[in-house]
Structure formats: C-alpha cells, structure tokens
Regions:
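Amphipathic alpha-helical dimerization/coiled-coil segments
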Residues: 2, 78-137
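N-terminal helix-turn-helix DNA-binding core of bacterial DNA-binding proteins
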Residues: 2-44, 67-75
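A structural preference for long, well-packed, hydrophobic secondary-structure segments
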Residues: 14, 25, 52-55, 72, ...
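A general structural signal for well-ordered secondary-structure junctions
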Residues: 14-17, 29, 59, 109-113
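Alpha-helical residues within the helix-turn-helix
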Residues: 37, 48, 54-55
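Intrinsically disordered, low-complexity linker/tail regions enriched in Pro/Ser/Thr
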Residues: 49-50, 60
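Beta-hairpin "wing" of winged helix-turn-helix
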Residues: 55-64, 71-73
Length: 137
C-alpha cells in the first residue's frame, strides 16, 4: 500500500497537479507526448513528474509498441480513490480547464485509440486535426 505521505508529497507541485487533472478529465490512458503537448512543456519535464507520481503509487505505466501509456491507479487504496474524487471536484481553475481543452484536441488526433503523432507544437495540433477531419469527410 502506498503511504499517504508519499501521495501528498507527490501532489505538492503545480505541474503534477496539472498532470493528475489531465488523467481525471480524460479518464483514459495517456502517452507522454500527449501530455507534453497539452501542458506545453518539454517531454523530459513531463517524464520526470510522471516518475514521481508513479513512485507514489498514483499511476500505472504500460508499454504499447513505441509509446508508454500512463493511467491513474484507481484500485491502489481507498485513500487514493477518495483523494481522486476530491481532486476531480476542485481542479477546475482556469489553467486546469485550458489544459483539459488542449488535451481533448490532442486526443482527437489518435487513430484506433492510439497515439500516432509524437511530439508536436500547438499550431501543428490544430492543422493535423483539420486534415484528419477532411480525410473523414
């Protein structure tokens, strides 16, 4: 079982709270590149913060081909489940809402539920989304 102190320490950083918010909003596995694009942060920073959250028992990681997908470990402990419920109600500030909107745009680029794009800039995200919509039409 994960120690409560480790869980709370891991959440004592704005970037890690923003990452947890992405998981709560998406309610699905996310790859590092999707999170990096949504938060406009470099991949190495996202990876560093994901490692801390994973070490605290908040996240699970699963390799699928080229990408590693992360998800919230909702089964770890009753404390963690309760904490995630509280966070989902209170992480709605403007920054968190903007992050969730960017993530939704980025997830729209998935094919068959998988990340196929890698790291891109925000302007490229919009361009790729339009191209994908045009191909479907």
């Amino acid at each position: 079982m994960t120690e409560p102190v480790e869980i709370f320490k891991s959440l004592g950083d704005e970037t890690r709270l923003r990452l947890v918010n992405l998981f709560l909003q998406a309610d699905e596995e996310l790859c590092v590149c999707e999170m990096a694009d949504a938060l406009d942060l470099p991949q190495y920073q996202i990876s560093k913060h994901l490692t801390i959250l994973k070490s605290a028992g908040l996240l699970l990681a699963k390799r699928k081909g080229t990408w590693v997908y992360y998800s919230v470990d909702r089964e770890e402990s009753p404390l963690l489940r309760d904490l995630l419920k509280v966070l989902s109600r209170h992480l709605s500030q403007q920054q968190f809402a903007a992050d969730a909107a960017k993530l939704a745009q980025r997830l729209a680029l998935r094919e068959d539920g998988k990340c196929v794009v890698g790291f891109i800039l925000s302007a490229q995200t919009n361009k790729l989304r339009r191209q994908k919509s045009e191909r479907k039409a």
